[in-house]
Swiss-Prot record:
It is a single-pass membrane protein. FAD binds at residues 35, 49, 126, 330. Glycans are attached at residue 236. Residues 1-23 form the signal peptide. It comes from the Eukaryota. SUPFAM superfamilies: FAD/NAD(P)-binding domain. GO terms for biological process: secondary metabolite biosynthetic process. This is FAD-dependent monooxygenase sdgC. It comes from Emericella nidulans (strain FGSC A4 / ATCC 38163 / CBS 112.46 / NRRL 194 / M139). Keywords: FAD, Flavoprotein, Glycoprotein, Membrane, Monooxygenase, Oxidoreductase, Signal, Transmembrane, Transmembrane helix.
Amino acid sequence: MDKRSFKVIVVGGSIAGLTLAHSLDLAGIDYIVLEKHSDPLATVGGSVGLLPNGWRILHQLGLRHQLEQEACPVKVAHMTYPDGFVFSDNFPAAIQERQVPEIQFPIGYMPANDERFGYSLSVLTRQQLIEVLYLGLRDKSKIKVGQRVIKIQHHQNRRGVSVFTESGQEHVGDLVAGADGVHSITRSQMWLQLGQKLDAEKERRQLVAEYSCVFGISSPLKGIPPGEQLIACHDNATVLAFPGKDAHIGWGLIQKLNRPCNSPATTQSSDGETALIMAKSAAGLGLCKDLKFHDLWVNTPKYSFTILEEGLFQIWHHGRIMTPNMAQGANTAIEGAAALANTLRRISQIDKPSEDDINRLLQGYTVRQQKRLRAVHAISRSVTRVHARQGRIKKIIGRYVYPYTPGAALHTFSRIIAPAPCLDYVPMPFPGPGWTRALVSGWSPISGVLLLVIPIIALVYGYSVINFGRDSINN
């Protein structure tokens, strides 16, 4: 099949959607992106963190240099505790740099000089990342703004699918890829078409919320300089702070809900009153020496509130509709887009692909990505609960185990990141030996990860799992 005769309709101009657009363009596949906002650069969300798995794909897309102008590399991470104890770890620098000291790892193997990935752990705003992705597109006319999708319909007597928008337009393509967040119209339409084959209510219940979050960007504060990450752990609450290059601080206040909830009606809130109540209750929480949450709050002109949902949908595709789980943070959104592009390229290479061809290849994608995301999902749950000191065991692990296992973060982080997918039809950069080691030794995302993974990843995925923006929450 001529790749340009195969057309993909991407729903959502999110981080995932724009990454997929770049990837399809490099594959020679025709596409359009339907974005509901009238401005493709609409300011939505707070800070995001780029990890090596996200960096590598963006490097393949030719965007590394532009992003390095915007992103602030993190060199050290600080964790603070209610008793005043502070633990600092320079593993963020060690992930990129070549000088890693020999360390005796108390639970076994800890390689010292083969786990760096050549990319920094970096912080930037979601707005900056979206701008780099959008402005880097070769053909911006393919981004259709003001196109809120209301219906997706498979063609009965011919190949393809139609997407209808609120403005009355119909867009025709061969396959629809949803990159429109957790509360996705693409997913809803897929569930509707599955009908009795799917217990939609059971699938919706895959998302459960136990925590809420207020997030924003504060003006600079003395004591939280660029290049440093701060995680303040308190009972049932956590404050995360990530200064950018301009010293403005992306932050998030995460608090445990009184009871879990999974109703969509209660999980799409932007309730300013609730945010104010949360902020007032947390005003006295210590961040670091001489700084409290109140100092961040009074220096933040704009903030948002959301419920943090956790879960992994089981059904990702039906017919010519694909809704990968692209809502686990910027890095897994980027991963998912690249892995989906690999699959769509294979479909486009088939002469007149049948429904069976499409289903077979999309199912293969689903199985591979679900296996990886199950590990990420398990880690993300643990991260939130260790940070919030939920229960005696997690308090002990976070306060008394993690700080005394030097090198553990570097080792475990490497095992999580190294097997990450990237574009398989674009030259693969190997800027650090960690990537090569993964291919040679066959690391898996969870091999060798014992109880220590909980506090270890608490620092690492403080950036990635809780990205305070549209890709990690909703569209």
